[in-house]
Amino acid sequence: MNRTLTRRRFVAGAAGMAVTVALPRTAAARRRRRRRTADVCIVGAGLAGLTAARNIVRSGRDVIVLEARDRVGGRTRNAQVGPGVVTELGAEFVGPTQDRILALARAVGVDTFPTYNAGSNVLIVDGQRTLYPAATGFSEQSAFVDAVSVIPALDAMAAQVGVTAPWKAPRASEWDAMTLGQFRDANIPSTGGRALFDAAVRGIWGAEASELSLLFALFYVAAAGNPQTPGSFVRLFSTPNAAQESRFVRGSQEVAIQVARRLGSRVVLESPVRRIESGSDTVTVVADHDEVRARRVIVAVPPVLANRIGYSPALPRTKARLLRRIVPGNLLKWEAVYERPFWRDAGLSGQGVTDQGPAQVPFDNSPPQGAPGILFSFVGGDFARAAQRQSTAEHQATFAENMAAFFGDEARNMTGYLEGNWTTDPWTRGCPVGHTGRNVLATLGPQLRKPVGTIHFAGTETADYWFGYMDGAVRSGERAAREVLRSL
């Protein structure tokens, strides 16, 4: 692997994200670029790009993967918190029906272990703290009941939305003209129920319900399954038999690390792509340090970044409009490290939900051996935007108070604190997923996965099933690889 890509280099960058600026494209700079050729060039070494590369190489074709960062993994990123102990600052959970990421992990020797889910979850509404069983994930408290009362309706509507073409749903235009927030207000009677629903929305999308098209949200629900299993809203926010059921041993980034290791020198780090020049049967991909001539290119980066690449000729107007209107989420991860998972002593799972912010949905993120203890929570939507104006020290103090409300005073006794802030990462610019507001998906959606000549597109925002998740990224890479191989 290029640029002395040891395993240490792959994991590098976990403590922070470097700010990078565009470099001037002088003649001298062009002369210094390494000129390469391949059947396929792939932009981005996240799970989508690496999966596409793996499948294309296995079919006997040449590939070069250009990655802007000094590591692989995209929106998966490990951070070491002790000898042999990692936590994840990005995507981490996997669960039933996420078949493709689980198959890829097995193929490269990465095992899973169950998310800690024993004992009771904590619910806080109007300052009142109650417990409910982690095994079911449901409380009989009135606000909680109100919040989940809309799930049957959401699931029924989502069943009418096809994952391959949600814009063809019978009521696509009607639903795309509404927001999820409008649906919430019309169907959840209590203030507390709406607040708990919003907490789930922020954790799932990193956005406010008012920012999401109802059609987009229904597509997302429909996508939380596989061809044999219909999607459901419960599968998005629950732990047992749902999206948060399991984690990867050695951290989620380990999957990308192992795939990249097998690709070897085909993966080139610290090579941000600036321009793609496409012809009828060839394409030239221009990066800061490399220039690749290929027969096809796969752009496997978030839409907000794909839109920042220069294209010659320009992308079709509708494709460019869609890339501009897929808005990255605002989601932070705040993580506290403790000597041990003390909450387990009190029979608590480390999970919960509150109507107050900013840290509304905690999880036990401890390693398989149980120590050190780690708690994390998502901070999403408006709470994440407000947090961007605060210091890390303020985040830590706020997080300590939030966790103490859930799990008692011992939560203030942190031995370490970490956070994942993807909005400030120039090569992501938001997390966990891009979303669309009103009147986008029904009109521009057909452009989502559509190739443009020799340019193909991958990434979790182009997935059918598990759009927004690691599984969706893998599925999109597999689909893009199939497209390219058919064209060669």
List where the protein language model places each region.
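Active-site/ligand-binding neighborhood in enzyme catalytic cores
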Residues: 162-271, 280-282, 300, 310, ...
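Conserved N-terminal glycine-rich FAD pyrophosphate-binding loop of Rossmann-like flavoproteins
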Residues: 71-92
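Central helical "cap/lid" subdomain
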Residues: 278, 287-345
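N-terminal Rossmann-like FAD-binding beta1-loop-alpha1 element of flavoenzymes
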Residues: 40-64
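Glycine-rich FAD pyrophosphate-binding loop
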Residues: 57-78
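Dinucleotide-binding Rossmann-like beta1-alpha1 core, especially the glycine-rich loop
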Residues: 85-156
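Conserved flavin/dinucleotide-binding core of flavoenzymes
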Residues: 59, 133-134, 282, 300, ...
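N-terminal secretory signal peptides and thylakoid transit peptides that target proteins
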Residues: 1-17
